A protein has these predicted regions:
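A general "terminal functional-core" signal
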Residues: 1-124
């Protein structure tokens, strides 16, 4: 599964099993709706391990991301992914990526939020 800015780098994308290219300026609501639909489709794959690249370049203040997500939207994205994995007993490995916000502290805060949300989701 890859959810990404359709017109963003790399311009020639290697296809994945499920690609969702979003238009420039996509907001929280549209992004999260697309993610919910995609997670339904991922259920059919039944992966043994989820490799989650929690990119923060969709953040509104990111200079290169071209999407328009808020901190809250990114946190909800993470929550949806982690809850999806937890409920299905799927182990998840988290990597961070992107992060070209101005100010850069926005990227740092978004990275930290991913791990805060993971801690909440997997706290036993």
């Amino acid at each position: 599964l890859s959810i990404h800015g359709e017109k963003n780098f790399p311009f020639r994308k290697v296809p994945s099993d499920l690609d969702i290219g979003l238009p420039d300026g996509t907001d929280d609501r549209r992004y999260l709706r697309e993610l919910a639909d995609a997670l339904d489709a991922v259920s059919a794959f039944r992966p043994d391990l989820v490799l989650y690249l929690s990119g923060v370049d969709p953040l509104r203040s990111d200079k290169l991301g071209r999407l328009d997500l808020t901190f809250e939207g990114l946190m909800e994205r993470d929550r949806m992914v982690f809850e999806f994995c937890r409920r299905r007993g799927m182990p998840v490995s988290i990597a961070i990526g992107g992060g070209y916000a101005d100010p850069i502290t926005d990227s740092v805060e978004a990275y930290a939020n991913t791990f805060r949300v993971a801690r909440e989701a997997f706290r036993g």
